[in-house]
């Protein structure tokens, strides 16, 4: 076999050198890409760990808030039950006091006429009893004979019981 010509050897050497440079360049790029991927993976892992920690903390905060809200709910429900019991007691008291209130309203409505009656009775007491007189001759302006619409029973009762003014209140 004969040796390849020098030009072919130089071309082959140049080609091999170019392939070697290209391989070295690709290996350098591959190393850089691997470092980049490794750095990104570490950052993603760290970020994932931070997110998991934040998520865990959010879960704990949520659980604490739920516990606090449940406690507030129980306190509020106890307050509502207490207030309902108070309302029931007051409703019962109102129910018991209602007849008395109606009676007091009735008394208040009747007070002015009653006050007038008491004033008239006081005036009658101030005037005092009539002087003794002859039953056959009544005093002028005094009681006269029974009226037509009077019954004999009323006349008998008037003669049996003399009128005495006074208050028993």
Curated annotation (Swiss-Prot):
UniProt feature coiled coil, ranges: 7-89
Compositional bias (Pro residues): 136-146
Keywords: Coiled coil, Cytoplasm
Region Disordered, annotated ranges: 126-169
Domain of life: Eukaryota
Biased composition (Low complexity): 126-135
The protein, known as: Vimentin-type intermediate filament-associated coiled-coil protein
Organism of derivation: Homo sapiens (Human)
Gene label: VMAC
């Amino acid at each position: 076999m004969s040796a390849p010509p020098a030009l072919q050897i130089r071309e082959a050497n140049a080609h091999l050198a170019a392939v070697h440079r290209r391989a070295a360049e690709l290996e350098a790029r591959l190393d850089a890409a691997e470092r980049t991927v490794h750095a990104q993976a570490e950052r993603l892992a760290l970020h994932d760990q931070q997110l998991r920690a934040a998520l865990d903390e959010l879960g704990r905060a949520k659980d604490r808030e739920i516990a606090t809200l449940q406690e507030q709910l129980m306190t509020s429900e106890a307050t509502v039950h207490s207030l309902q019991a108070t309302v029931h007691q007051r409703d019962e008291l109102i129910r018991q006091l209602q007849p008395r209130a109606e009676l007091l309203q009735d008394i208040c409505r009747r007070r002015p006429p009653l006050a007038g009656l008491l004033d008239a009775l006081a005036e009658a007491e101030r005037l005092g009893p009539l002087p003794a007189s002859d039953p056959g001759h009544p005093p002028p302006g005094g009681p006269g004979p029974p009226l037509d619409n009077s019954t004999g029973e009323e006349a008998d009762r008037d003669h049996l019981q003399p009128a005495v003014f006074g208050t028993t209140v």
